Amino acid sequence: MISVDRLSEEQALGMKEQEWAGPEALCPGWQEEEVSDGEGPEDSGHPDPTAHAYEVLQHTLRLEGMPLTIDRTGQPRTGSGPLDMTVCVLGSPTAFLPVLLEGGTRYPGAMVLCLAPAWASRVPSETSPGSWSLLLSRGVSFEAGGCTALEEFVPPRRATYVTGTFGSEGSWEGELARDLDCPTGGSALLTRWLEDPLLSRWLLSARAGLPVPPTLAFITGLWETLPEEPEPPGVHLVRLQDPQGQESLVRDEVGAFLEGSSMQPYDQVAVRLSGWRWRGTDPHSTHRKVEGEAVAQAVAALLKGLREEESILLEALVPTARLPTLPPRSAAPRLPMALRICTVVCRSWGDRPQLCQVACTAGRAEVPVRHGSALPLGLDSSLRQWGLADAAQRQALAGQLREAAEAAMAALLAAEGELSPAQRGGARAHTDVLGVDFLLACVDGTLELVALSANCLRCLETCLLAEGMGHDVGQPAGDVPRLLAECLLHRAQCHLVEGKDILLIGAGGVSKSFVWEAAREYGLRIHLVESDPEHFAAGLVETFLPYDSREHRRDEEHAERVLEMLRARGLRPDACLSYWDDCVVLTALLCQRLGLPGCPPAAVRLAKQKSRTHQHLQRCRRGRPPPAAFSVPCRRLRSHGDVERAAGAVPFPAVAKLEFGAGAVGVRLVENAGQCHAHAAQLWHDLRADADHPGIGLGWGNAMLLMEYVPGTEHDVDLVLFEGRLLGAWVSDNGPTRVPTFLETAATLPSCLPADRQAQLVRAALRCCRACGLRHGVFNVELKLSPAGPRLLEINPRMGGFYLRDWMRAVYGPDLLLAAVLLALGLPPVLPSRPAPRQQLAGVMCLASEHGRALRGGVMAALQGLQRRGLVRLNPLFEEAGGRYEEPCLSVACAGDGPAEACGRLLGLCQALGIDSPQYPVGHFLSHFK
C-alpha cells in the first residue's frame, strides 16, 4: 500500500474551483446526437430509427474527418465463403465506432455494422443443434483509411462474431444475438447481470478479494443469480419475504449497519435502487450517518415499488483520500472533492483479462461522481492534481490498479462461466469487454482502491472520450480501439477454425504433446500422417494414417502415396501443415499437390539444407544491406576429401554439424582440420540412418557442413509472414552454450537487447526468409549478434520448438500454433500490432547426464508441485537419454517483472534443487541476461 505520510512536499498548482456539468452525460464527440448507456437506433424515438442512425453515422464520420459512407447496394457483394470473417456490431452507430474503424484498418471488410433488425436474419445452425446462425443481408462495412460502404450481401454473410449495444429489455439487438452458434460478446441477459451493482459488488469482494464500500442490501425473492456462498466482506444481505409491513425489521437492520464497525470510518450514506432499470442513476437520497430514522424511512419508502431481481442498497459514501497540499493560491475556501476511476478491461489472448485504459472524473464530494458528469483526465495527471507528487508512488498505484481491474474481470468471468446457457443468453455468449469503477480512499494512513461496480459501456464511453480529447491536442492514438479490435477479431478467427479438417504431417515426441490439447481447444479435426504406427497420438486424432516416410530422399513418392490414402478415405483437408523438422518438405509437396496455401517445396528444401541456405544467400546481392551480408562462409562435407577442401575455404575455429540436423545434435566446435576429421569420422560412424537417432534429419543422409564460427550472443527470432508481409516478430535470447557441443543451456523472453538491436535481428531474419522464398508461414530463425551485426546460423521452416510456443503465450498472449493453422488455411492471423510483455521468463535446460538422478529422486515431484502453484513453468522435451548425442530432457523456467527478478528466482530454485552444480553452472548460463 502507498502511505499518505510518505507524500512529497512538492505539489503542483492547487486545484481550482470547477464548474460542473450537472447530471446530464457529456458523451464523446462522436456521440453528440446519441443516447448514452448503449441505447440503439430503435430507442431514439425518431420516426425512422434506421434512417436516423445512418444520419448519425454520417455526421460522426464527418466530425472525425473520415469520408462519408459509399452506397454500394446497387452492386451486391457476392462470393462470401466459409473462411470469410465477419465481426458484426448490432445497434448504436457510434458506441463502437473507434473499434470498427480500427478493425477496418487491421482487417479490411471484416467489420460490419448492422443498424436495423431487417438487415439480418436468424436461421437454424447447421453445426450446433438448438442454436442459430446470424446472416447479414445488409450492413455498413469498414475498410482501411476510415472508408465505409453500405452493402447488400448476396448470399447473406454469416456472422463469425457478434456484439452490440444490448440495451433495453426486448431490444432487437438482444433478440438477434440470442442463442447464436458463433461467439457473442455479451447478450441482453449478461448485460442485465453485469450491470447490477449488488451482484457485481458481491463478486468483486468475494471472488476478486477487492475492498468495496460497506453495503446493506434489501432483496425480495430467491435471486438465483447470487452465488451460493457466505456473505463477502463489506456486503450484508437482508432477504424480505414480503416487502410490505417490514418497517420494524428495516429499522433494526439499518440501525445495526450504521452503528457497525464497518461504518466507523464514514460519516455519510446513500440510499439507492439497484437493478437493470436503475443502472447509472444517482442515489435516491444521501444522509449523515447519525440520521438513522431518516435513513430507515428512505429505505422503507422504496420497498413499495421493488420488483423481483431488484434491491435497495444502503452504502457508505467512501470519501476520496485527502492528500497533503500546499496552501492554495486563492483565499477562497477549497471544497471537498471526489475522484472516480474508470477502467476498461478486455478478454485478451488465452482468455486472460487485460487492462486497456484508465480515465478519471472529478466532482464535488456531496454526491457520488457520475459517469459523464465532467471531462475526464488520465490517471497520472489526476493523481498529480490530487497531490501525489512522487512519480514512483503514482507508478505503484497504477500497477495496483491494473492488478485490481484484471482481478475484477477474472472474478466476473469465472462467475459468468457458472451460469447456464439460458442464463447467459446462449452457450457462446460471454463478456469480452467490461468497465470497472474504483474510488481512491485512505484506510489507516494508506491509499486503497475501493471497487464500486462493473458496467458494459459507461467506462468505455468515458475512456473513448478521453482518447478523443487527447487526439484534439495532438497526442498519439490510445490503446482502447486497437486492443478491443484485436480482441473481437481474434475471437472471430478462433471460431473460423472450428471444425476445419487439418492434415498434420508428423506427430513428433513428448515435446509436441501440447498440439493435441490445442486441437481440442480450437475444435480442429486432425488427420495425422505418422511413421510410427504405435504413436500415442493415434487415439487423440480424428483420423490416424500410419505411413513410413522416414526416408526423406523419396518425399516426392511419399507425397503421392499420402494423396492416395486421402482419396481412399474421401478426405479433403482444409489445410496441411507440420511442426516437425523432418516433415517440412513432405508437407510443402502435399500443399502444392492439394492446392493449399504454403511455401514452395524448393524454398523449404533450400532452408532445410543448411549449406545451400548460406550459399544461396551469398548470391543475393540486392538491397541495403543485401541478404548476403547475413550469411556465413560454409562448405558441405560428405567425405574426408571434402574436409580438406573446406579447411582451405573456412577459417578456424569453425563449427561442424549435420547438414539436415536438428536440436544441435552432432554440433561441435573444431579448432583445426584434424579435429574436424575426427569429429566427422565419429559422427558418420554413429549416425547413419533415422533409427540411430530419430527426428534429426538422418532421413536425408548424414552429410555435414563446416561453418565459420561467429562470436557474439545467440538469439531466436520467430516470424509470422502472410504472403511476404510481416505480421509478427518476437526475439528471445539464449545463454552461453556448453562448448564444444553448443547444446542450449538457458534462454529468456522477452529479449534483454535494446529495441534497435532487436530490430536488427528481426530485419535480418526477415530478409533471409524472403530471399529463400519463405513468404508464407511461421518460421524460427537462429542468429548470432556479432560485433558487426546479425549473422544467420540457420532457418527452421516451421514454428519454434522446445518451449517457445508455451513461453510466447505466457509472455505475449498469441499462439504460434493457431497462427500456423490460420496461415495454412490462407488467412492472415490477427496478432498484436504493439506486443507488450506481461512478464519476463528465464529458463534453464536439464540434461539426463547431469540431472537424471536428481529428477528421479524427488526433484521432479517438487517441480510439478511448484508448477501447480504457478511458481515455475515446465516443458518436457525429450525422453531421458544421455550419451554422445544428448538432447535436453526438460526446460525449467521462472517468471519475474524483469530479467533480474526472473533470473534470481530461477538461480535460487536451481541451487535449492541441485540443478546448479560446478559441472552445470546455472549462474554462468544466465549471465548474459542483463
From Swiss-Prot:
Region (Disordered): 1-24
Textual note on the cofactor: Binds 2 magnesium or manganese ions per subunit.
Record: residues binding Mg(2+) 2: E794, N796
EC number(s) recorded for this UniProt protein: 6.3.2.11
Listed GO MF terms: ATP binding; ATP hydrolysis activity; carnosine synthase activity; homocarnosine synthase activity; metal ion binding
Residues engaged in binding ATP: 650-716
Keyword Nucleotide-binding found: yes
Residues at which Mn(2+) 2 binds: E794, N796
Residues holding Mn(2+) 1: E782, E794
Task performed by this protein: Catalyzes the synthesis of carnosine and homocarnosine. Carnosine is synthesized more efficiently than homocarnosine.
Subunit structure as annotated in this protein's UniProt entry: Homotetramer.
Name of the protein in its database record: Carnosine synthase 1
UniProt organism field: Gallus gallus (Chicken)
